[in-house]
């Protein structure tokens, strides 16, 4: 696993990935892009294929979200990951949002704040939870903002990406 993580950063840098993401956002009419930690099954242990937040930000934490605008970006981490996040995003433009700390907006509040009037927030509908999407939409309503589902992660992360899991499902 560590070898794969190193490959991420040899291939190109976080600033280059953010530039590519911003270009794709612009091409798709997206003002803000949200990358949550998640997969289509809301798995507790994330398959490597769905580590898009790590790929674009360099941060390896759990229970996180990453928001990118044309001019800024921020990653949310809970208390277990404050020190790790500081180290992993050091030297980048990415702002660390310490979840639960006084004065720190939730990811939903932040999306509502940075989205322009009548703006469009993009996210991959496969990885975002229903609760997250509803919370974000509630914040966007004040600005008449909309959510557009598109998968810029698949479009941009084409080299060295682990395959989607092909393991059998278990009926519980």
Regions found by a protein language model. Give the residues of each.
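Acidic beta-strand-to-loop metal/phosphate-binding motif
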Residues: 120-126
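Short, Lys/Arg-enriched N-terminal segments with co-localized hydrophobic residues
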Residues: 2-10
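N-terminal accessory/capping or targeting/presequence segment of soluble
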Residues: 9-117, 128-172
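Glycine-rich repeat segments that build the extracellular carbohydrate-interaction surface of secreted
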Residues: 1, 35, 124
């Amino acid at each position: 696993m560590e070898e794969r993580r190193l490959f991420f950063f040899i291939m190109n840098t976080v600033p280059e990935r953010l530039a590519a993401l911003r270009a794709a956002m612009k091409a798709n009419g997206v003002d803000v892009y949200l990358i949550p930690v998640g997969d289509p099954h809301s798995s507790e242990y994330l398959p490597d294929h769905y580590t898009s937040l790590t790929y674009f930000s360099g941060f390896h934490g759990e229970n996180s979200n990453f928001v990118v605008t044309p001019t800024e970006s921020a990653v949310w981490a809970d208390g277990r990951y404050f020190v790790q996040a500081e180290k992993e995003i050091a030297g980048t433009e990415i702002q660390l949002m310490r979840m639960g700390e006084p004065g720190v907006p939730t990811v939903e509040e932040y999306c509502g704040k940075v989205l322009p009037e009548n703006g469009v927030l993009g996210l991959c509908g496969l990885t975002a939870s229903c609760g997250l999407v509803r919370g974000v939409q509630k914040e966007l309503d004040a600005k008449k903002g909309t959510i557009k589902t598109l998968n810029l992660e698949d479009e941009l992360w084409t080299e060295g990406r682990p395959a989607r899991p092909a393991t059998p499902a278990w009926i519980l």
